[in-house]
């Protein structure tokens, strides 16, 4: 090869002798010759003389005047240190407009490589006889109810031990598929939902789940998956957008680029520079700088990042945070592009992209796919892209098509032959139908008939298997088989094509990148750390004033109080680490994604999260120790002060590491919040304070020796009590006071135990961090979803595959309905005509047709700080600029515009869904001013994010919506019939028993969730319906089903408005009118679409300079293209201004004027009540839904009961028979310790584990309340009331086990008091957890606030410092501390009436309980009432918070 390159270079040198002096090597270098710039030539010559290593790191950069230099000045730069500004300016010069300049830029790159004979590496992917099978539960067994979860767990263990049969049924996901993916060709993967597209992409990318049964093989250039690293050779781009919300778009992509590295670009560049020097070729400066900069790894912001931002159209939002549910960020379409860009910045040569166009308008999709096509064709990549609804022009960009259906390859080969194959099978694509849409529908039993074209033969359903068999005999299929029979010649594989190293950059670089990201996130989450520090400061001030030195003496009695103060310091610091739990779990989904993509190993993630927390630990612990140490009156020695500080630092680190480890093992908020308190409880109970070491049972003593708290307790106690303050010798004893106190509690008395304790804590810190790293290395992301299918869906799948008619299928009815409704585009066909009455049956419950008109509507928000920092002086950012229009009954309106045009914003404003910002303008409903309370009753809003309760079924979701939104006059039977009609209409009947689940985690697929969202609104029978992106995320067939549903809804006389991104021709032409907006929030066309889009085309073609539409081109795509910002700039026009001066605008103004006046004889909307159903019905419905939600949420309900059983058995065995011993004071302390630990820790677990459940349901509540389904109180009632029976079961389990094992006195009264106090204690803790969520915006802050109060309750519980010994200024708090009342009730009911005298004391047990703790037996009834009051108060505050605070930002 080198000889060949040398020969080419020689030929070029010889040829240059007889050319006319010009440079023959490159068009791009002619400018270099023409300029005749001596200084530049000298600079280049100097560069050429550098060694290759230095030469590839330096280049000549043109600095334009706006970048700080003189116009066009050339400067020599180190490309490894190219600034962000220079990088962006360079990309702007190279790719000014992604549409026009991108191909030219790539051709320049290719030309430069071709001139010296260097090839880009290419990859051919082959898959042969690939079969993927999964085991699924069929029918109700797949629902995760409490019963099923127990049965499934027992069954799984039985299967593993081969003692029980496997009840799951095998389901083939991919059935014996074979094919070839060629380099330099774009392959489009099509298929209806459930056809196996994602599974095929994952198989090709080498990322299939280990639980699946896989046979067959996938090879890259003839190499098996085990011979290289597929995760780095190929990039799989998921359909789920998982990103860290606090990072900006640029930071997200830059981090990805930094981790993935530059691949073989550097080696290629070195070879290129060497050959160019030998051939005396001078490259284009900008191309040279780009190639050099893109080959330099380890940069915080790379030129490749700026390039990808540019071609994906993300440069406009590059410095905006990505955002999440609670943090406003970029739009859904932009987030989808970030997911794509995250992988494109890497060096992977093969791309497997899963539904990358969801949420994008068709012009943006076209631009992205076109950029990818240019890259693949010119630079020799390999790409398989799955798209849901590709527009015809996007479809035409692809070279090859793979059509999957029910796990079989129906067609794979050149795009040109696909229609030929289906005509060969007897099916033809209609004229105004997108080919991609036709392909996705033609294999479906319900849609196939309409495309039959053989008039000489009657139509008969052609099953998928028949298509697949026919394809093998079709000429395209035969040629693939022939090619597969010849093995790939491995000698043709470029050595740089397949990655063999596991990670893209060195370990040092990976660690540096993750440290930088962790620092950035700490800065963005500074509020959390400040909050924790303030929390600890307040806690320290309370502790300091509770254990006040002036009220405490150094004697044996107060020695116990000092021990309590030390234990509380340990407890506080330990609890402080608890917040790590929620913060860690929230970051894990993104971590698992990046780990599996081999961005970095687990240790590169865990080390920064540990090391960078250390300075914060110094601050937090410092705050506590510096405030409390001397004020409490601990030993005044400076060395002992710093030793206590050092020990608490080690404990805090150990605690944080422990909770990170638990989060890493649990991987789920509910599971982690269950096992977090369990570990705390185990360590505390065996730590030597609650139960003294001599009293620990011999079968539990091992627990004492492995509890970190026992080492901390020994170390902190010896540090204090061996000090000078405690050195006096007691009369009649030969040991110091300090040693005497230590001995009385079974604590070691040698000074060495401080160092042993410190060493143990540091050892545990290392151990837990190591275990956390191991957990994150080996565990997969948490999923509680078991693969399941309904029986109907399985039968339907089988029928589609084989053609066998399934018994009981309502085939005739549904096919007749489908055929009636098939041609959406035809406004006069089955959709609008009388024969569609069958499909409208049930959609005609009585309602009043209403119009909505709006005039000069403006919406603004406070100017973001980032924009103010850039010098913008206005106080507000205007998002809608005086928008006017109207929507009428029976008219289907499309609200369109490019991403960022303000479509969803306008819809939110009109629907009254905005929670912030400033709204101006006039909005009227049938002429009357809009009132949100009544408007919510007659309107429906289908949100883009499909938000539903995850633990109910599809049918239950619809029942709930209809129950609360249909008026009470509609009886139960009519309601059920109506629900069945809607389910039939939206094709959800086969999914009626399917669990909804969480998006991207479990339950329904994207398109099924979308249909459910629409059905939930349709069952409310609204007059006006808003739909935000109803077809986003759906394939062509599902989109057609949805649009038929929408069309039918309009035909009943309702007003329907849809925002829509990338409609196909037939979907677009199903709309009657179009409301088109441009970026910036202004309308540019409001009017009819017309037959075959004639009116729309006529309007825009009438504007000077607008290009005419090509035959067969999608009008929606054409319209977005000709009205883009780039076109406005090129034509020098403002489309919004043209619209305002048009006749159409005047007609619309007159229409708005007419609709703004109430019709004669009409009355304003008025309802006797705010809600459709009575308050009682709302409460019952909410309770009904929560009942199902809890029953099917075993990760919360079952885990909590399991936790309770474990704790009960642990406590029962730990405090075995201690209840019968009441002879000594220590016996009472031990018994009280068992009560104290149980109350505090089981209570905390209940409080913590309910929070994630409430957070998920609160998001659903925001949607349902906005829809006017119910008020806040019934929701709160349902959430609170459903806990009562579950907590009753929990109390009985705990109470019976513990009461009998500890051996408390068996009398009916004492046992019932014990159960009563435990029940209400668990209730108030659970309601307190709910209240914390209600008062805070997210889980993390709720966890921090909760733990703050747990600490205060712990302090004033009366266990660490009895109420009579608390300083008078804090004693009042005991009366409002719930835990203090619980201990009062438990201790007084068990011991307050025992009259025998204590050993070594003159008092009876009852007197001691009264004197020492201040507990009176005759006060029990008051204590009981207070317990009820606490539970009711927290439940009420939860209701109040839910009613008053809305943390959703819209």
Swiss-Prot record:
* Xref: InterPro entries: AAA+_ATPase, ABC2_TM, ABC_trans_N, ABC_transporter-like_ATP-bd, ABCG_dom, ABCG_PDR_1, ABCG_PDR_2, P-loop_NTPase
Compartments, as annotated in UniProt:
Membrane
Instruction: List the GO terms this entry assigns under cellular component, sorted alphabetically.
Output: membrane
Keyword set includes 4Fe-4S: no
Specify where it is mainly localized. membrane
Keyword annotations for this protein?
ATP-binding, Membrane, Nucleotide-binding, Repeat, Transmembrane, Transmembrane helix, Transport
Q: Which GO terms describe its molecular function?
A: ABC-type transporter activity; ATP binding; ATP hydrolysis activity
| Residues covered by the ABC transporter domain | 158-431, 852-1104
Which residues take part in binding ATP 1?
Answer: 191-198
Q: Does the keyword Ribosomal protein apply?
A: no
Against PROSITE patterns, the record matches this protein to:
ABC_TRANSPORTER_2
Q: Show where the ABC transmembrane type-2 domain sits.
A: 509-721, 1177-1391
Binding locations of ATP 2: 897-904
Concerning Gene3D superfamilies, the annotation shows: P-loop containing nucleotide triphosphate hydrolases (3.40.50.300)
Q: How does it sit in the membrane?
A: Multi-pass membrane protein
Transmembrane feature ranges: 527-547, 559-579, 614-634, 646-666, 670-690, 756-776, 1198-1218, 1236-1256, 1284-1304, 1311-1331, 1341-1361, 1372-1392, 1422-1442
Function (record text) = May be a general defense protein.
Family named by the database record: Belongs to the ABC transporter superfamily. ABCG family. PDR (TC 3.A.1.205) subfamily.
Name of the featured protein: ABC transporter G family member 37
Organism, by scientific name, is Oryza sativa subsp. japonica (Rice)
């Amino acid at each position: 090869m080198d000889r060949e390159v040398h020969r080419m270079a020689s030929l070029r040198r010889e040829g240059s002798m007889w050319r006319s002096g010009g440079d023959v090597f490159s068009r791009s270098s002619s400018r270099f010759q023409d300029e005749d710039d001596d200084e530049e030539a000298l600079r280049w010559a100097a560069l050429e003389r550098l060694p290759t290593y230095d030469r590839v790191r330096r280049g000549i950069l043109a600095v334009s005047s706006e970048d700080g230099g003189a116009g066009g000045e050339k400067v020599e730069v180190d490309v490894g240190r190219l600034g962000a500004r220079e990088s962006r300016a360079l990309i702007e010069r190279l790719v000014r407009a992604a549409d026009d300049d991108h191909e030219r830029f790539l051709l320049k790159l290719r030309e430069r490589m071709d001139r010296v004979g260097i090839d880009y590496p290419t990859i051919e992917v082959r898959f042969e006889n690939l079969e993927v099978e999964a085991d699924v539960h069929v029918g109700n067994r797949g629902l995760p109810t409490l019963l099923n979860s127990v049965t499934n767990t027992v069954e799984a263990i039985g299967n593993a031990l081969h003692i029980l049969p496997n009840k799951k049924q095998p389901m083939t996901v991919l059935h014996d598929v074979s094919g070839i993916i060629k380099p330099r060709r774009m392959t489009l993967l099509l298929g209806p939902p459930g056809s196996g597209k994602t599974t095929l992409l994952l198989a090709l990318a080498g990322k299939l789940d280990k639980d699946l049964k896989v046979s067959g093989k996938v090879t890259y250039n003839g190499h098996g998956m085990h011979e290289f690293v597929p995760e780095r050779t190929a990039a799989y781009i998921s359909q789920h957008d998982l990103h860290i919300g606090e990072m900006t778009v640029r930071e997200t992509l830059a981090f990805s680029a930094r981790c993935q590295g530059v691949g073989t670009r550097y080696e290629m560049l070195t070879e290129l520079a060497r050959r160019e020097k030998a051939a005396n070729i001078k490259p284009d400066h900008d191309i040279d700088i780009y190639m050099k900069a893109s080959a330099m790894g380890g940069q915080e912001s790379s030129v490749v990042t700026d390039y990808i931002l540019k071609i994906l159209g993300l440069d406009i939002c590059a410095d905006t945070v990505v955002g999440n549910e609670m943090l406003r960020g970029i739009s859904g379409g932009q987030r989808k592009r970030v997911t794509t860009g995250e992988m494109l910045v890497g060096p992977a040569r093969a791309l497997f992209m899963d539904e990358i166009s969801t949420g994008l308008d068709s012009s943006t999709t076209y631009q992205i796919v076109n950029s990818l096509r240019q890259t693949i064709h010119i630079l020799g990549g390999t790409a398989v892209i799955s798209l849901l609804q590709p527009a015809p022009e996007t479809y035409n960009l692809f070279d090859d098509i793979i059509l999957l259906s029910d796990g079989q390859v129906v067609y794979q080969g050149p795009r040109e032959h696909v229609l030929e194959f289906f005509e060969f099978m007897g099916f033809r694509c209609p004229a105004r139908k997108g080919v991609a849409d036709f392909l996705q529908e033609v294999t479906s039993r319900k849609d196939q008939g309409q495309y039959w074209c053989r008039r000489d033969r009657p139509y008969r359903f052609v099953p998928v298997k028949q298509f697949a068999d026919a394809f093998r005999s079709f000429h395209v299929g035969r040629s693939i088989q022939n090619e597969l029979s010849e093995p790939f010649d491995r000698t043709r594989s470029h050595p740089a094509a397949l990655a063999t190293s596991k990670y893209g950059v060195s370990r040092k670089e990976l660690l540096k990148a993750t440290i930088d990201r962790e620092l950035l996130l700490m800065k963005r989450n500074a509020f959390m750390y400040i909050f924790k520090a303030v929390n600890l400061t307040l806690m320290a001030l309370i502790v300091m004033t509770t254990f006040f030195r002036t009220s405490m003496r150094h004697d044996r009695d107060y020695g116990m109080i000092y021990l309590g103060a030390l234990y509380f310091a340990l407890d506080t610091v330990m609890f402080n680490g608890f917040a790590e739990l929620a913060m860690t779990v929230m970051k894990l989904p993104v971590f698992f994604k990046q780990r599996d993509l081999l961005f970095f190993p687990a240790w590169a993630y865990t080390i920064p999260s540990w090391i960078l927390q250390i300075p914060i630990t110094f601050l937090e612990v410092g705050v506590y120790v510096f405030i409390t140490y001397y004020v409490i009156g601990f030993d005044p020695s400076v060395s002992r002060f710093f030793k206590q500080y050092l020990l608490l630092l080690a404990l805090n680190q150990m605690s944080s590491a422990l909770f990170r480890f638990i989060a890493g093992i649990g991987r789920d908020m509910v599971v982690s919040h269950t096992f977090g308190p369990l570990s705390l409880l185990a360590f505390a109970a065996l730590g030597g304070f609650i139960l003294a070491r001599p009293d620990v049972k011999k079968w539990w003593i091992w627990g004492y020796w492995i509890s970190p708290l026992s080492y901390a307790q020994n170390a902190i106690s010896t540090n204090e009590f061996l000090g000078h303050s405690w050195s006096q010798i007691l009369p009649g004893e030969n040991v110091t006071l300090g040693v005497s106190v230590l001995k009385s509690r079974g604590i070691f008395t040698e000074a060495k135990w401080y160092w042993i304790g410190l060493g143990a804590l540091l050892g545990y810190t290392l151990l837990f961090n190591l275990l956390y790293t191991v957990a994150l290395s080996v565990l997969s992301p948490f999923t509680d979803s078991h693969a399941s299918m309904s029986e109907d869906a399985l039968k339907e799948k089988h029928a589609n595959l084989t053609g066998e008619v399934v018994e009981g299928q309502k085939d005739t009815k549904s096919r007749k309905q489908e055929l009636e409704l098939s041609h959406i585009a035809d406004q006069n066909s089955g959709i609008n005509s009388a024969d569609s009455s069958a499909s409208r049956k049930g959609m005609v419950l009585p309602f009043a047709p209403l119009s909505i008109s709006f005039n000069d509507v403006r919406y603004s928000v406070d100017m973001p700080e980032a924009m103010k920092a850039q010098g913008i002086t206005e106080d507000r950012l205007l998002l809608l600029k005086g928008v006017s229009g109207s929507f009428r009954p029976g008219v289907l309106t499309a609200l369109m515009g490019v991403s960022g045009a303000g479509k969803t914003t306008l819809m939110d404003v009109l629907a009254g869904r905005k929670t912030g910002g400033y709204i101006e303008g006039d909005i009227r409903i049938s002429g009357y001013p809009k009132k949100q309370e009544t408007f919510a009753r007659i309107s429906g809003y289908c949100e883009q994010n499909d938000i539903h309760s995850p633990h109910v079924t599809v049918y239950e979701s619809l029942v709930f919506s209809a129950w609360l939104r249909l008026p009470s006059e509609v009886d139960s039977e009519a309601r059920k019939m109506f629900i069945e009609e809607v389910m039939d209409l939206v094709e959800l009947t086969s999914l009626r028993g399917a669990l909804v689940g969480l998006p991207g985690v479990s339950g329904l697929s994207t398109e099924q969730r979308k249909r459910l969202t629409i059905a939930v609104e349709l069952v409310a029978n609204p007059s006006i319906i808003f739909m935000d992106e109803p077809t986003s995320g759906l394939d062509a067939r599902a989109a057609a089903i949805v649009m038929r549903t929408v069309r039918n809804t309009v035909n009943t006389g309702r007003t329907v408005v849809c925002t829509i991104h990338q409609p196909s021709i037939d979907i677009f032409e199903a709309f009657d009118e179009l409301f088109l907006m441009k970026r910036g929030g202004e309308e540019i066309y409001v009017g009819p679409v017309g037959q075959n889009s004639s009116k729309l085309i006529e309007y825009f073609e009438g504007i000077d300079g607008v290009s005419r539409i090509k035959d067969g081109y999608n009008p929606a795509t054409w319209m977005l293209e000709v009205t883009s910002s780039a076109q406005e700039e090129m034509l020098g026009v403002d489309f919004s201004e043209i619209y305002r001066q048009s006749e159409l605008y005047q007609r619309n103004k007159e229409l708005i004027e007419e609709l703004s006046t109430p019709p004669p004889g009409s009355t304003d909307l008025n309802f006797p009540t705010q809600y459709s159903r009575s308050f009682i019905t709302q409460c019952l419905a909410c309770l009904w839904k929560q009942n199902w939600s809890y029953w099917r949420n075993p990760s919360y309900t079952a885990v909590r009961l399991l936790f309770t059983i474990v704790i009960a058995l642990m406590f029962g065995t730990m405090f075995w028979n201690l209840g019968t011993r009441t002879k000594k004071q220590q016996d009472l302390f031990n018994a009280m310790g068992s009560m104290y630990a149980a109350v505090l820790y089981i209570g905390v677990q209940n409080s913590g584990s309910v929070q994630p459940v409430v957070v998920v349901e609160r998001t659903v509540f925001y949607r349902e309340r906005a829809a006017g389904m119910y008020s806040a109180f019934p929701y709160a009632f349902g959430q609170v009331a459903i806990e009562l029976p579950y907590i009753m079961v929990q109390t009985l389990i705990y109470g019976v086990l513990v009461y009998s094992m500890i051996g408390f006195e068996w009398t009916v009264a004492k046992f019932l008091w014990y159960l009563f106090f435990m029940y209400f204690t668990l209730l108030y803790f659970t309601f307190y957890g709910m209240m914390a969520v209600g008062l805070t915006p997210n889980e993390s802050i709720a966890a921090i606030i909760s733990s703050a109060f747990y600490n205060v309750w712990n302090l004033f519980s009366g266990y660490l410092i009895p109420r009579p010994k608390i300083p008078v200024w804090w004693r009042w708090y005991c009366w409002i501390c719930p835990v203090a009342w619980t201990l009062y009730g438990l201790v007084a009911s068990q011991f307050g009436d025992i009259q025998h005298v204590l050993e070594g004391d003159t008092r009876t047990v009852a007197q001691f309980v009264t004197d020492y703790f201040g507990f009176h037996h005759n006060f029990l009834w008051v204590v009981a009432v207070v317990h009820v009051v606490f539970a009711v108060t927290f439940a009420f505050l939860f209701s109040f918070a839910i009613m008053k605070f809305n943390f959703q930002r819209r």
